[in-house]
């Protein structure tokens, strides 16, 4: 069972971490396995049971007592040498009372029958120093701070609205915390190991419309003081927009694209104009499924995505 590998990968430094396992009325062995670990490691593992309609991120944060927070799905795991480096780094920052909002690491895909692939940020972030947004080099196209690469200060994560659908915890965690992240540190180790590709379902197209609107209205992008910060946010929104429109095209909902554009343009004309100037901007008025399909192929390769019915 993949869950064993995920939990075991957290226990090497069990005296310095808390492992919160959230079970939302699973119908398999999840709860039983989780309870066994809680019994074996009562000082480290805590099992939380909740209803299916309660966002797991919200309930986990309510129970979290750690200074920093990381999300790990049951089919992923943590690289062991990297775990030691991460804990030692955080311990050092706590010792010197440094204010660190976000720790970023590399991550890798370890998918059966496929070549291992590491994603590195060494050409983007300064190394061996705390830095802020203005210290970051220019972002490459398709660059994203991935959920698997982040360890966020718990108090920072608690500032955002965690009532969104569970399927969007990735976007909520990474995008939602941007206004509150001032200080960062990059650790050049492949900490998070993805054991599978991330899937995007065409049947969820309307949910992605809601996500796009939610992210768009979440905060005022132009209130962000750093130009690098604003640039990153617009690039992030561009990616979500392209995926949303592609799903609407594939599900034959072109009228929803027009309604989405009206919403975005009306609620933030300046941001909408900036979005249209991006690499994907020429697509916004075209609704050309073939062109969107080409971009999705790029995303699938860069982000290891799978588009499914």
Where are these regions (language model features)?
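Short, acidic, metal-binding catalytic loop of nucleotide-sugar glycosyltransferases
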Residues: 8-17
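Catalytic core of nucleotide-sugar-dependent glycosyltransferases
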Residues: 189-198, 202-228, 240-269
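Membrane-interface aromatic/basic loop that binds lipid-linked glycans or pyrophosphate carriers
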Residues: 252-309
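Glycine-rich, basic loop-to-helix element that forms the pyrophosphate-binding segment
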Residues: 49-65, 74
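Conserved short acidic donor-positioning loop in nucleotide-sugar-dependent glycosyltransferases
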Residues: 10, 24-25, 51
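Donor-binding/catalytic cores of nucleotide-activated saccharide
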Residues: 77-183, 199-203
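A conserved acidic beta->alpha catalytic loop
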Residues: 23-32
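Short aromatic/hydrophobic "clamp" motif used to bind/position activated sugar donors
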Residues: 69
